[in-house]
UniProtKB/Swiss-Prot annotation:
UniProt effect for mutating H151D: In LCA13; exhibits a profound loss of catalytic activity
GO molecular function: 11-cis-retinol dehydrogenase activity; all-trans-retinol dehydrogenase (NAD+) activity; all-trans-retinol dehydrogenase (NADP+) activity
Protein name, as recorded: Retinol dehydrogenase 12
Phenotype for L274P: In retinal dystrophy; exhibits a profound loss of catalytic activity
Top-level taxonomy: Eukaryota, Metazoa, Chordata, Craniata, Vertebrata
Recorded superkingdom: Eukaryota
Presence of keyword Membrane: yes
Originating species: Homo sapiens (Human)
Length: 316
């Protein structure tokens, strides 16, 4: 027992000693474009913390007017204040957006459209992960409702503003977890069977399929769209899982920081020449492969139609 404990102690001591080298290896790609954004308007959901906050910070540093769209306005204002000071850009604004409530989504969109005549970048970044079973205000399973349907509706409501501002981009933050996901059309609300882990994976697959179908429907409009995997990042998303919280504490020296996790979102929002890759999936600032389910055009179209039906909208 003592020998085993000693070996484990030595192993973890060694890991932490070489952590800087390991982290450098796993830090991933870097957005290298120097594009500046004066006069450009950006909306980022969930930008009060984590990857979204770092994405907002970078875009604000390039001169964009950035809207932090989040549920907790107080946390949003705290993040915005910090970003304004860091970037010397006063045009960092906070607006309430609760993706678990379609009334809130519609109210946000109505307010934004009244304020702004243009929208150049929409980053659908917010999300939930491994929540206990619950439903949104509209009766959707929470992962499906927040991670997919909420952003689906938001994009629909803001799309005409994106079109008149073209060239414009929509970035959907997905995850490598989509490889495990499937779309359970027979039980979309997980009422028959629920696994918090699989529910998250299913919603991330929905993000990739939405991106694929959206790109097809946006051809010729000047609006392009991309799905991204940010990497394994220190994040508040794991707060609903005590096991993941423990693992995060143990392995935090080896995972990406929020700033590193933001790089692929920034790349897809800013990099020149990505238009031919609209609808594709990116990781570490380069296109990468998706699961066979994520390449299924029939599933993508069916999900689109079912999403419209659930939300009560017509989106041809």
């Amino acid at each position: 027992m003592l020998v085993t404990l000693g070996l484990l102690t030595s192993f973890f001591s060694f890991l932490y000693m070489v952590a800087p080298s390991i982290r450098k290896f796993f830090a991933g790609g870097v957005c290298r474009t120097n594009v500046q954004l004066p006069g450009k308007v950006v909306v980022i959901t969930g930008a009060n913390t984590g990857i979204g906050k770092e994405t907002a910070r970078e875009l604000a540093s390039r001169g964009a007017r950035v809207y932090i769209a989040c549920r907790d306005v107080l946390k949003g204002e705290s993040a915005a204040s910090e970003i304004r000071v860091d970037t010397k850009n006063s045009q960092v604004l906070v607006r309430k957006l609760d993706l678990s409530d379609t009334k809130s989504i519609r109210a946000f969109a109505e307010g934004f459209l009244a304020e702004e005549k243009q929208l150049h970048i929409l980053i659908n970044n917010a999300g939930v992960m491994m929540c206990p079973y619950s439903k949104t205000a509209d009766g959707f399973e929470t992962h499906l409702g927040v991670n997919h349907l909420g952003h689906f509706l938001l994009t629909y409501l803001l799309l005409e503003r994106l079109k008149v501002s073209a060239p414009a981009r929509v970035v959907n933050v997905s995850s490598v977890a989509h490889h495990i996901g499937k779309i359970p059309f027979h039980d979309l609300q997980s009422e028959k069977r629920y696994s918090r882990g699989f529910a998250y994976c299913h919603s991330k697959l929905a993000n990739v399929l939405f991106t694929r179908e959206l790109a097809k429907r946006l051809q010729g409009t000047g609006v392009t769209t991309y799905a991204v995997h940010p990497g394994v990042v220190r994040s508040e998303l794991v707060r609903h899982s005590s096991l993941l919280c423990l693992l995060w504490r143990l392995f935090s020296p080896f995972v990406k920081t929020a700033r590193e996790g933001a790089q692929t979102s920034l790349h897809c929002a800013l990099a020149e020449g990505l238009e031919p890759l609209s609808g594709k999936y990116f990781s570490d600032c380069k296109r990468t492969w998706v699961s066979p389910r994520a390449r299924n055009n029939k599933t993508a179209e069916r999900l689109w139609n079912v999403s419209c039906e659930l939300l009560g909208i017509r989106w041809e």
